[in-house]
Every structure is written in structure tokens, then in C-alpha cells.
């Protein structure tokens, strides 16, 4: 019986950290890889790559824990989240806090193997991860904070590789914020009706009937900034084809969200994994030395 209870708790932690749903980690991973490949340029050192890949998974898990901790009083009133570990009682508040601390400490131990500039920047990463979940109570722009949190690995990657933060770093950071606002607005469109009822704020509510238009403008901004990064770094034509393919995926997403149906909006959100992948492949091929 004791083993069964332990197994149930581990499964609850697994769900709390969303390790059963890798989409969030992938949306965090792709910009990290973009930055590492541009900063190097090309293939980064294997240890630095390993630290950032592991750090992505640890900090995404930590972010999910603190997000559910912040929303524990709201999730019980939303159909999609009512069975999450905290509102259902599968994980206690103390256990969630302890799990968050363990995940953050593991990530910080990895960062300690890098240079001082990267270690210093990691403090801001922790602050953003902690602050984001609470923003939806106070502002209709929590997605901007999410973009900063998901994109903070970009300056950290540049710092780890070159101990500098060039223009390309900040253009990529801005592109990631625009992208995150676009895809997380799609995600928020799924819960918009429930969020209005319980007082949660989001860009999906703020944008209202202009949501699809503004998402389209943000997506155009992402393409423009990524193309500019390619030009600044002298990338080849294959990279720009990747940017165009990403644009085609954005067009597909616009078609999906046109009628604002929940399942279609969620499908559009999930499709952003391919946007990140395509842009990374474009970068990797541009730096490939035959």
C-alpha cells in the first residue's frame, strides 16, 4: 500500500511539472537553441548545450509548479483545470513549494558551471518565472511577461558563449516576446469565457474581437525580426526559406483560429512547436559547414 501511495504521489508530481505535456518545454527550447547557434555561430560547445537543454526542462517544470500554485484557488472553477494536482488535493501546497525549490536549485547548480555573466542573468530568469503566474491578476498583458520569461534564455545563451549581448540578442528576445504573446493569446482564447467569469486577465480578453488581427500583426513582426537577424549575421538563402515556411504555418494558424473555436485555437497553439523547429533548422543549416 505504501508503494502505491508513493507511486500516486510521483504521478501527481509528474502531472504538476507537465512532463507529460512537453509543448511548453519545446516552446522554451527552440529560442534557446536559436540563440546558441547564432551566438557561437553554429554548433555550441556540448557542455553549454547540455546545460541549457537540461535547464530548459528544469525551469519549465518549475514554472508549471509555481503557475499552478498561483492559480490553485482559480483552477477549481475552470473545467479544463479542475483536476490538476493542487485543486484536486493530489499534491499539497507545501509539497508544491518544496518541489519548486528543488527544481530551481538543480537548474542553478547547472548555471554555476558557466561564466559569471550568465550566473548573474539567471537571477532575472528566476524572478520572471516567479512573477509571471501572478500577473494575470493585475494586468491584461501577462503574455508579455511570459514572453520575457520564456525568452530570457536568449541573453543567457549569448552571455554563456560570448560574454556579450549584441543587437542580434535583443532582436531575438523581442521576436520571442511577440511570438509568445501570439501563441499564448491563442491558448488564452480556449479559456476566455471561463477567465472572464473568475476575473483572470489575458490578452485574449484585452484584444477582444480584434484578437486574430493582432495575432497576425505579431506574427508578421516575428518574421520581420527573424529575417533582420538573418541579414545582420549574413545567413544564407536557406534560412530565409525557413522564415517563409514559418510564415506559412502562421497563415495556417490564422485559418484555425478564424472562428475562435476552442479545439481549433488549441490546435493553433500546439502548431507553434513547428514554427520554432523550422526556424531552428533554418539556422542550423545556414551554419552547416560542408
From Swiss-Prot:
It catalyses: all-trans-octaprenyl diphosphate + 4-hydroxybenzoate = 4-hydroxy-3-(all-trans-octaprenyl)benzoate + diphosphate. GO terms for cellular component: plasma membrane. Pathway: Cofactor biosynthesis; ubiquinone biosynthesis. Its EC number is 2.5.1.39. It comes from Salmonella paratyphi C (strain RKS4594). Keywords: Cell inner membrane, Cell membrane, Magnesium, Membrane, Transferase, Transmembrane, Transmembrane helix, Ubiquinone biosynthesis. It comes from the Bacteria. This is 4-hydroxybenzoate octaprenyltransferase. The chain crosses the membrane at residues 23-43, 46-66, 99-119, 141-161, 163-183, 212-232, 233-253, 268-288. It is an enzyme of class 2 (transferase). It is a multi-pass membrane protein.
Amino acid at each position: 500500500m505504501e508503494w502505491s501511495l508513493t507511486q500516486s504521489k510521483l504521478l501527481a508530481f509528474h502531472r504538476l511539472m507537465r512532463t507529460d505535456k512537453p509543448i511548453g518545454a519545446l516552446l522554451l527550447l527552440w529560442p534557446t537553441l536559436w540563440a546558441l547557434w547564432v551566438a557561437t555561430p553554429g554548433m555550441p560547445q556540448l557542455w553549454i548545450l547540455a546545460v541549457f537543454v537540461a535547464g530548459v526542462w528544469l525551469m519549465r517544470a518549475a514554472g508549471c509548479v509555481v503557475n499552478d500554485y498561483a492559480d490553485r484557488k482559480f483552477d477549481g472553477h475552470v473545467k479544463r483545470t479542475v483536476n490538476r494536482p493542487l485543486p484536486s488535493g493530489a499534491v499539497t501546497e507545501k509539497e508544491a513549494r518544496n518541489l519548486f525549490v528543488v527544481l530551481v536549485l538543480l537548474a542553478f547548480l547547472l548555471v554555476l558551471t558557466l561564466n559569471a555573466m550568465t550566473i548573474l542573468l539567471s537571477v532575472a530568469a528566476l524572478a520572471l518565472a516567479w512573477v509571471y503566474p501572478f500577473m494575470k491578476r493585475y494586468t491584461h498583458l501577462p503574455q508579455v511577461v511570459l514572453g520575457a520569461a520564456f525568452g530570457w534564455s536568449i541573453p543567457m545563451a549569448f552571455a554563456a558563449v560570448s560574454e556579450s549581448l549584441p543587437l542580434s540578442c535583443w532582436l531575438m528576445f523581442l521576436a520571442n516576446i511577440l511570438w509568445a504573446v501570439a501563441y499564448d493569446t491563442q491558448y488564452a482564447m480556449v479559456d476566455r469565457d471561463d477567465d472572464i467569469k473568475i476575473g483572470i486577465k489575458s490578452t485574449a480578453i484585452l484584444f477582444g474581437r480584434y484578437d486574430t488581427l493582432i495575432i497576425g500583426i505579431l506574427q508578421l513582426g516575428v518574421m520581420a525580426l527573424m529575417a533582420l537577424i538573418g541579414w545582420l549575421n549574413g545567413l544564407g538563402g536557406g534560412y530565409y526559406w525557413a522564415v517563409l515556411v514559418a510564415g506559412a504555418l502562421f497563415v495556417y494558424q490564422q485559418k484555425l483560429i478564424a472562428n475562435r473555436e476552442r479545439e481549433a485555437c488549441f490546435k493553433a497553439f500546439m502548431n507553434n512547436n513547428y514554427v520554432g523547429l523550422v526556424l531552428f533548422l533554418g539556422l542550423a543549416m545556414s551554419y552547416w559547414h560542408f
